[in-house]
A protein has these predicted regions:
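Juxtamembrane intracellular "pre-TM" segments in multi-pass secondary transporters
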Residues: 2-12, 189-216, 398-407
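Residue-level signature of mid-helix packing/kink "hotspots" within the transmembrane helices
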Residues: 58-66, 150-151, 255-259, 263, ...
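Conserved MFS/SLC helix-loop-helix module at the cytosolic interface between two early adjacent transmembrane helices
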Residues: 63-96, 271-272
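Helix-breaking motifs and short loop linkers at transmembrane-helix boundaries and internal kinks
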Residues: 76, 97-102, 273, 294-296
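Structural signature of the two symmetry-related core transmembrane helices
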Residues: 79-93, 174, 276-290
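Paired small-residue
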Residues: 102-110, 299-307
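Cytoplasmic helix-loop-helix junction between adjacent transmembrane helices
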Residues: 109-145, 321
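C-terminal membrane-cytosol helix-exit motif in multi-pass small-molecule transporters
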Residues: 175-193, 380-385
Length: 407
């Protein structure tokens, strides 16, 4: 992290407050990861209903991501950060007030606005602030808020749920995100980049289907399906196997692995290219799901968690930096919104689809099916990530530059 010593005081302060806000955001959000499915089951929901409620989170992301990206480009990143953090602070209080499926779906969808706004504005602001030649390194370090939060949050949530019940759990989640709001207030919004008058006016769907965005979005779609099924059902799968493992430890192990990978992959990608690390992350995702599919003891579950953390800790930052490389400053919010649309769709439909599979096939066979998704994602990236198959292979293996990068 020596790169930060070379930055001026105002830039360091901005990055520090942004990092603190991100840490509170992901801790509050992640405190519900291992516990909310159990809460929904506690009030009498079926496996499919659990999947539908959990998947509703991504519906909020899906509906709001395009508008949040555009708002970040037009009005600045800070206002979108505030919108996202406010949604994250309010939603946990809503869970306390309802005990039926439909209202829970509505609140869960509202909760999804938090990531649509905060995550989009966060990565856009970091990209604005990072020096171009150290972009991968700075984005990698600043993205550590995710594994740190996802490591701290489930431990807090699991402890509170087991020792004090659901009310303190939801109140603590709201309190953490309220602290995040206080961290955003002193952040100085950088000047808004203006669009040149002679530039092409691409709409959201034109951006999404363009060569520079389409393949990363498809890879994120398949990864979102995998991650959505895992995060929705891993707690229930562990419980169904009878293995003596706190589900919160699964998420903590994944977070430790994710943290470790982000320490060096960002800086390494500045030297070896983004494509190589995207490929490595998809390989790790495949091995992760295989471990979980075959797990019958704590070691295999934790090994799967370690591989999943390495995969997600590499894939999301690498795609984020890849999209930054391919975007001009005045369109970064929309580019991030479009590329992450695939991830949102995957998360949105994973719960209902794989909840149905879990009802008929059981949790173990359901995870077996998800293995194919990561293999397909890897094949697509290896063959379609650049102009043609040979060029794509070279890019995906770190042998050539990204032809879509903005020079």
């Amino acid at each position: 992290m020596k790169a930060f010593d070379t930055f001026d005081a105002n830039l360091r302060k901005n990055l520090l407050m942004l990092f603190a806000a991100g840490l509170f955001f992901w801790s509050g959000l992640a405190s519900l990861l291992p516990t909310l499915p159990l809460y929904i089951e506690h009030i009498g929901a079926s496996k499919q209903e659990i999947g539908i409620v959990m998947g509703s989170f991504a519906i909020g992301m899906l509906l709001c991501r395009p508008s949040m990206g555009a708002l970040a480009d037009i009005r600045g990143r800070k206002i979108v950060l505030l919108i996202g953090m406010s949604a994250a602070a309010i939603a946990p209080l809503g869970y306390l007030c309802v005990k039926s499926i439909i209202p829970l779906m509505v609140i869960r969808a509202f909760h999804g606005i938090s990531i649509a706004a905060f995550a989009t504005a966060y990565i856009a602001l970091v990209s604005d602030l990072a020096p171009e030649h150290r972009r991968g390194e700075v984005v990698g370090y600043m993205s550590l808020v995710n594994p740190l939060g996802v490591g701290i949050g489930p431990a807090i949530g699991g402890f509170l749920q087991a020792s004090a019940g659901y009310t303190p759990l939801f109140l603590s989640s709201a309190a953490l995100c309220s602290l995040g709001l206080l961290c955003i207030i002193p952040i100085i919004n950088p000047p808004i980049a203006t669009k040149p008058t002679n530039s092409k006016n691409d709409n959201f769907w034109q951006i999404l289907t363009s060569h520079r965005v389409r393949i990363p979005a498809i890879v994120l779609l398949l990864s979102g399906l995998t991650l959505g099924s895992l995060h929705t059902f891993i707690s229930l799968f562990i419980k169904s196997t009878g293995v003596d493992l706190n589900p919160g430890l699964f998420f903590t192990a994944a977070a430790v692995s994710s943290f470790s990978c982000r320490l060096f992959t960002g800086k390494a990608s500045d030297r070896y290219g983004r494509g190589l690390f995207v490929t490595m992350s998809l390989i790790a995702y495949t091995f992760s799901v295989i471990c979980i599919w075959q797990a019958n003891n704590s070691f295999m579950f934790l090994l799967g968690a370690f591989m999943e953390g390495a995969a997600s800790g590499t894939l999301i930052p690498m795609i984020s930096v890849l999209m930054t490389d391919r975007a001009l400053p005045y369109e970064r919010g929309r580019i991030f919104g479009a590329s992450l649309m695939g991830f949102d769709i995957g998360l949105a439909i994973a719960g209902p689809i794989f909840g149905t599979f879990a009802e008929t096939l059981g949790y173990r066979n359901m995870f077996g099916l998800t293995t194919g998704l990561t293999v397909i994602a890897m094949i697509i990236f290896l063959t379609q990530s650049s102009r043609n198959i040979p060029q794509s292979l070279r890019f995906a293996l770190g042998r050539t530059e990204d032809i879509y990068a903005v020079k």
